[in-house]
Amino acid sequence: MDQEQERGISRLWRAFRTVKEMVRDRGYFITQEEIDLSLEDFKVKYCDSMGKPQRKMMSFQSNPTEESIEKFPEMGSLWVEFCDEASVGVKTMKNFVVHITEKNFQTGIFIYQSGITPSANKILPTAAPAVIETFPEASLVVNITHHELVPKHIRLSDAEKKELLKRYRLKESQLPRIQRMDPVALYLGLKRGEVIKIIRKSETSGRYASYRICL
């Protein structure tokens, strides 16, 4: 195996780990063992005898934890798929949408290598009421939420959001905003109208919280 291929596998392994962390951070059940999978074990499990990654084998399902279901009753199961094809066309995306809808997944996460055609992107809304999110592999090699300058973000439930607005006598329009395409919003799968609590460290008071609504 040449150095370039070795580097490619290492990047894919890191992206796989980030996806597992992302799914866990959204409140789905992922074991620490899955996240701690070593590069060598990853190669054994997901590469063929020639050392080529078999992305289809990396796909997985995850269900919400009991704690998450209590907080977000509408939260259903999730399916993550890594695409073998370099460029994603209509047929591949249609197959993915069919899989998500037929198996009644609430969320589908589709991870691609280099690009998705505009025609394939137009198919995504047909999965409704399920939500399909797409991520390029390269965006997942590093987990952005682990950066020391990124504060902790926590998604609020509807009840917590109502309590927040009531406590501070605010309307939704008065809350600071976070764009749906913000990297952390994408990581957490935030939807329009959802509120996140951001916990920052403060030199004077230890920690302080602020809130943003997703638009």
Curated annotation (Swiss-Prot):
Pfam family, one: RNA_pol_Rpb5_N
Record-level Gene Ontology MF annotations: DNA binding; DNA-directed RNA polymerase activity
SUPFAM superfamilies named among the record's database cross-references: Eukaryotic RPB5 N-terminal domain, RPB5-like RNA polymerase subunit
Record has Transcription as a keyword: yes
Gene3D superfamilies attached to this UniProt entry: RNA polymerase, Rpb5, N-terminal domain (3.40.1340.10), RPB5-like RNA polymerase subunit (3.90.940.20)
GO CC terms, sorted: RNA polymerase I complex; RNA polymerase II, core complex; RNA polymerase III complex
Location(s), subcellular: Nucleus
PANTHER family the record matches: DNA-DIRECTED RNA POLYMERASES I, II, AND III SUBUNIT RPABC1
Stated role: DNA-dependent RNA polymerase catalyzes the transcription of DNA into RNA using the four ribonucleoside triphosphates as substrates. Common component of RNA polymerases I, II and III which synthesize ribosomal RNA precursors, mRNA precursors and many functional non-coding RNAs, and small RNAs, such as 5S rRNA and tRNAs, respectively. Pol II is the central component of the basal RNA polymerase II transcription machinery. Pols are composed of mobile elements that move relative to each other.
NCBIfam families on file: PRK09570.1 (NF007129)
Family, as annotated: Belongs to the archaeal Rpo5/eukaryotic RPB5 RNA polymerase subunit family.
Designated name of the protein: DNA-directed RNA polymerases I, II, and III subunit RPABC1
Organism: Kluyveromyces marxianus (Yeast)
Gene name in the database record: RPB5
